[in-house]
Amino acid sequence: MAQKGNIGVTTENIFPVIKKFLYSDHEIFLREMVSNAVDATQKLKTLAERGDFKGELGDLTVRVSLDTDKGTLTISDRGIGMTEEEINKYINQIAFSGVTDFLDKYKDNANAIIGHFGLGFYSSFMVSKKVDIITRSYKEGAKAIKWSCDGSPEFEIEDAEKDDRGSDIVLHIDDDCKEFLEKQKIEELLNKYCKFMAVPVAFGKKTEWKDGKQQETDEDNIINNVEPLWTKTPSTLKDEDYKSFYRTLYPMQDEPLFWIHLNVDYPFNLTGILYFPRIKSNIELQRNKIQLYCNQVFVTDQVEGIVPEFLTLLHGVIDSPDIPLNVSRSYLQSDANVKKISKYITKKVADRLAAIFKENRKDYEEKWDDLKIFIHYGMLSQDDFYDRAKDFALLKDVDGKYFTYEEYQTLIKDNQTDKEGNLVYLYANDKEGEYSYIEAAKAKGYSVLLLDGQLDNPMVSMLEQKLEKTRFSRVDADIVDRLIQKEDKKESELAKDEKDNLEQTFRSQLPKMEKTEFYVDVQALGDQTLPVLITQSEYMRRMKEASKFQAGMAFYAQMPDTFNLVLNSDHPLIKQVLEDGKTACATELQPVESELKGLEARLAALHQSQNGKKQEEISQEEKDDVKNTESALEEQRTKKNNIIATYAAGNKVVHQLIDLALLQNGMLKGAALDSFLKRSVDLIK
């Protein structure tokens, strides 16, 4: 005779609440159902091993089956089953209080509700309008029981027919969840959540191509590997085993660089395998590739807070029963066990890298370009990892040679120490684009590093802070003699007027480029140095680069790129431009410059006469005199600049020198490049 009753909850109806708060994550019901079946099976195996179960274990496969006609999804096991008393204890009594407060607290975290109070079974009501449990305990003399509930607090228990031990959970799928009656959808979820569960899980039969179509065979379609690689002893495994397992996890990925097998049982339980993949150009696309398991049951691939931030770029599997999986992420990040696990993983990764570096440096160097993004990310984000990694982090020069930090300091300290005692690390970001600057530095006997990685620029800033009396400078940040200044710079012998005229000659002909500004500077660089070159301020360039990644630096992002056009006043070509300008502009410039000198003298005298007077003591006539003189000065300066600009516009050498400097920096393109080529031919004729 059927028995009816109410499920023991302190709220009127738990099921609408479950549906409301868990609907966004409703697919996990299948994980919970299959996981429960696996648990029941493993408990039976444990009882058998202890001698508490004397019967035959037989086939222990957990079976998942669909009946689209009846609209049901069934999960069956041959585990320990349940008696009527156990159903009352584990199914009918949801023993907790303060449910409303709890739901308010965790309403944004679906997983916090399931599991926290053992509600795994009740996740089935997220997709079901009715759930039946047909079960028979393994205990001798136990009878089969059927429990039914339609999602209200009421349930019904009655005798059932079931010859074998175990449980069948029959889910009558809700009308708005019909996708869970599709074979492809169930296969997808089983592969996602159950592919490494510890008991075989079957879904249908395997198929083969026969008589021109796919036909079912008699062989079960087992969807999981009950002994995944991370559960095995590392000493029994070969490299190919690890590579094969990686291909199983990530079929479309390139072969990993290497891997770390985690296996610890104290002070916490943790197993797993972490792979170092070959990182492509976009770091963000690499994240969320570590899969987190609890006793071989997939939980999530959102592992922030469990795995150190920089190691979220790794691939692989972590399995631990000691991580509280069904709580909020903020709780995870403050959990003592999680912190220990995070530190342990960091240490294991550092130890593995150090061992590879020590045992096979050649192989390590060959993999460095792929490895460095992990190492740099870790050094930038965690001080404890920096302290470990500084001994195996490498620097690579433009010739492809690798050095540890200590080795490189020893290499350059004699020749690359400036007059202030700073060790200067010269570097290039683009070996081809900065070639002439690199060669100029090498001609001085300097070593140049190649820093072309995604995180090399922030690494430079960090190393300047970590290493004492150390400065990094890109090879195009200044002329080579000033990159590492060993003595006071030589001043140009040109008079101020000559420098001003020379600067205006070139400034007037510089191209107008969007969000780009040029400044002209005259320096005495020696007659063997190039006549013209372009440099870019190390500080401003770094600030603009940092603004792409760091919040609060939008000011620098909006600023134009600034470049310095450096004129070598010692070079014959620059001297020629200056002398030609004097000759060509003498007649026009003489009266203008004479007028300028007179106006400058007059303005100086006016300022002198007003010196020491309060503003109200200066007459309007005196103020007007100053204003008119300043206006006349500006007019004459503009006139002078126009005369020089007219001369410069017709001087092919000026244009050729500017274009050569732009070409050297990859800034000469399109019509400007075409004009340069034609002019070059004319000059050769």
Residue ranges of each PLM-predicted region?
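GHKL (Bergerat-fold) ATPase N-terminal catalytic module, capturing the glycine-rich phosphate-binding loop
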Residues: 1-180, 188, 195, 343, ...
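GHKL/Bergerat-fold ATPase module in large chromosome/replication-associated machines
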Residues: 113, 131-154, 174-178, 184-685
